[in-house]
């Protein structure tokens, strides 16, 4: 019976062992194995409990020391901006909209505007002008028949030329009808030689009306030397001018005293008054009344033009006459400054159907080849300022 029982007990043991190896049922352990496994798990849990925080701290320190300090600079920049805002606005506004607007306005850098003051240094006064007869230092002789331009009138023209030329204190005679003859080609040649020596020089044209009924000298300032060309030339610095002696008022209305024939200062000033404020000054240029040089007595003064002698008249007194100077600057309507050909010289112009020698042009001043006649057209000059056309001298 015992042998029969042994095969019965051993038979179910084999499938139980095979079944546990497949993982379906837990293995059958003894007491020694259970004690060893429990002690090992306790040691592992205690080691991991202490090593994890140490590893975390060490890795954090390593990253802190090795990574670039981007976050630190950003934090410091934001802290600096906030401290700047606190200094600018020590009393914060509880309104969020106003605080946001103040932050946006303070973030923009204001533009520095310096405080400018007027300089105490002023340019010195201009040196008195000297008129020279040639390129040497010889002054123009005071003979009236050789002098069309007085120094007082030259000083008035000087105020209108470009500032760089106002500093020049001597004007030299480039061409004269008495000295060089009536030839337009000679005028061109003399101006060409002056331009070769002084490329930046300016030119003042002076023409005298010798008719008995008129006492007028007119001319122009030219930026370029006159020369024959097929088109207009010159700049906006060119201008036309005219000067005339004011007629004395009637003696019955302006005599200061009965004897001596001396006119009162008030009457002389009234004769050269500018137009009233209500007048139309659209085409009016610079208009000035200046005192001429003292006239010679009638017995000593030769028969010549009044402006050439600084406004001398036949009154026989030493009272200087009044010279009315008027300038016509560049108006900007067109660019017709100077136009010269071998047969004429013209200054200023327009584009209407009337002209002195052409049917399609108007000229401010036009001088013919023989230099014996001139004409003035209405281009940039009003009708009241026109001179008679075709006057001989």
Curated annotation (Swiss-Prot):
Low complexity compositional bias, start-end: 7-30, 70-83, 96-107
Subcellular location: Mitochondrion
Highest taxon listed in the record's lineage: Eukaryota
Pfam families cross-referenced by the UniProt entry: TLD (PF07534)
Entry annotated with the keyword Protein biosynthesis: no
Domain TLDc span(s) in chain numbering: 147-393
Biased composition (Polar residues): 279-290
Primary localization class, coarse: mitochondrion
A biological process term (GO) from this entry: response to oxidative stress
Annotated region (Disordered), positions in chain: 1-40, 63-114, 269-319
SMART domains in the record: TLDc
Keywords: Mitochondrion
GO cellular component terms listed in the entry, alphabetical order: mitochondrion; nucleus
InterPro entries reported for this sequence: TLDc_dom
Cysteines engaged in disulfide bonds, as pairs: none
Protein family according to the UniProt entry: Belongs to the OXR1 family.
PANTHER family attached to this UniProt entry: MUSTARD, ISOFORM V, NUCLEOLAR PROTEIN 7/ESTROGEN RECEPTOR COACTIVATOR-RELATED
Function according to Swiss-Prot or TrEMBL: May be involved in protection from oxidative damage.
Protein name from the UniProt record: Oxidation resistance protein 1
């Amino acid at each position: 019976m015992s042998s029969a029982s042994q095969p019965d007990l051993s038979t179910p043991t084999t499938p139980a062992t095979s079944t546990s190896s497949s993982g379906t049922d837990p293995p059958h352990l003894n007491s020694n194995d259970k004690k060893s496994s429990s002690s090992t798990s306790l040691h592992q849990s205690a080691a991991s409990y202490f090593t994890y925080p140490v590893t975390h701290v060490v890795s954090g320190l390593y990253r802190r020391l090795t990574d670039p300090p981007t976050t630190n600079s950003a934090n410091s920049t934001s802290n600096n901006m906030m401290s700047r805002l606190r200094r600018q606005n020590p009393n914060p506004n509880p309104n969020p909209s106003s605080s946001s607007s103040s932050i946006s306005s303070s973030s923009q850098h204001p533009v520095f505007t310096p405080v400018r003051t007027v300089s105490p240094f002023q340019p010195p006064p201009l040196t008195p002008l000297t008129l020279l007869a040639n390129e040497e230092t010889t002054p123009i002789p005071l003979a009236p028949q050789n002098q069309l331009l007085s120094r007082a009138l030259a000083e008035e023209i000087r105020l209108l030329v470009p500032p760089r030329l106002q500093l020049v204190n001597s004007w030299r005679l480039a061409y004269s009808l008495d000295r060089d003859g009536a030839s337009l080609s000679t005028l061109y040649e003399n101006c060409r030689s002056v331009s070769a020596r002084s490329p930046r020089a300016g030119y003042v044209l002076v023409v005298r009306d010798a008719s008995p009924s008129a006492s007028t000298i007119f001319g122009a300032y030219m930026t370029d030397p006159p020369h024959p060309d097929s088109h207009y030339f010159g700049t906006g610095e060119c201008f036309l001018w005219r000067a005339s002696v004011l007629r004395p008022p009637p003696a019955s209305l302006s005599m200061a005293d009965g004897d001596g024939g001396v006119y009162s200062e008030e009457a002389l000033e009234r004769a050269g008054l500018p137009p009233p404020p209500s007048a139309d000054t659209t085409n009016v240029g610079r208009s000035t009344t200046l005192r001429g040089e003292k006239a010679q007595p009638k017995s000593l003064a030769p028969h010549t033009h009044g402006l050439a002698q600084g406004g001398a008249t036949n009154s026989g007194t030493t009272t200087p006459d009044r010279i009315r100077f008027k300038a016509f600057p560049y108006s900007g309507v067109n660019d017709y400054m100077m136009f010269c050909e071998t047969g004429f010289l013209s200054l200023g112009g327009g584009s209407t159907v009337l002209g002195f020698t052409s049917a399609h042009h108007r000229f401010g001043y036009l001088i013919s080849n023989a230099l014996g006649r001139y004409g003035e057209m209405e281009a940039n000059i009003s009708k009241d300022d026109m001179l008679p056309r075709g006057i001989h001298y």
